[in-house]
Regions:
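A charged N-terminal "starter" segment
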Residues: 1-116, 121-135, 150, 175-189, ...
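Active-site loop/helix belt of alpha/beta enzymes
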Residues: 145-213
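Short, flexible active-site-adjacent loop segments at beta-strand->alpha-helix junctions, enriched
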Residues: 100, 143-145
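Residues in well-ordered beta-strands of folded domains
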Residues: 97, 138-140, 168
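Short beta-strand segments
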Residues: 53, 136-142, 192-194
Length: 213
């Protein structure tokens, strides 16, 4: 993978004259261009939307830039929900994916009208008890076993073991959860899955889609 720095050493030296170190420099042009590229790549899918993981870079300026480019945010904690709200995200702008979720976090996600993604079958009754069941709801799928891709063009081998992960539901749990959610008033259902970390190969996405659909 070619590394193309957006900042020259000379430019960095110039910035140092005015800004105390340490500091971070972000490429706004590059961020906007990449957001537009991914939106264009999936423009065939009317319902597509990119959700940026706030935990990756909880910087309000970056979040506002991505909001201007039509992106939503993926939150996993109360702090991330509050930050996203302060940046103007609300409702379907927010995907809330959390593990062992505290009551306050779940209530906040519900109050914001966020898409809530349940990672455990026991969370159905928990959500109903502490906040209520929204019309739109997601469940996280864990197919179990081992997930493996061949070596990528970059020379990386992608492998992880969803079967050892403590997050996500089996197919049977997914079906039971959807039935319970439907009985409690949910109307629209989504599927979420995260099968391997640090994947940089494009082959991951069609493989994952094949498992889900």
């Amino acid at each position: 993978m070619e590394k193309r720095p957006f900042l020259t050493e000379e430019q960095a030296q110039e910035i140092i004259q005015d800004v105390p170190t340490p500091f971070h420099v972000y490429d706004e042009k590059g961020i906007r261009e990449n957001a537009r590229r991914i939106n264009k790549a999936f423009s065939w899918n009317k319902g597509f939307r990119e959700y940026f993981a706030v935990k990756a870079l909880p910087n309000p300026i970056i979040l506002q830039i991505l909001k201007e480019e039509g992106c939503g945010v993926d939150c996993s904690s109360l702090t991330e929900l509050m930050l996203s709200e302060a940046c103007g995200f609300t409702g379907s702008d927010i995907m809330f994916s959390s593990n062992q979720t505290p009551v306050e976090d779940m209530k906040k996600a519900y109050e914001l009208g966020a898409y809530i993604n349940l990672d455990d079958a026991t969370r159905v009754d928990f959500l109903d008890r502490v906040a209520g069941i929204p019309e739109n709801i997601f469940c996280r799928y864990n197919p179990g076993g081992t997930f493996q891709l061949g070596e990528s063009e970059e020379g990386f081998q992608v492998m992880d073991k969803p079967g050892d992960a403590k997050y996500g539901m089996t197919e049977e749990q997914m079906i039971d959860s959807y039935k319970k959610l439907m009985a409690k008033g949910a109307k629209n259902f989504g599927i979420h899955a995260f099968l391997a970390s640090n994947t940089i190969s494009d082959a991951y996405y069609p493989e994952l889609a094949g498992i889900l659909f």
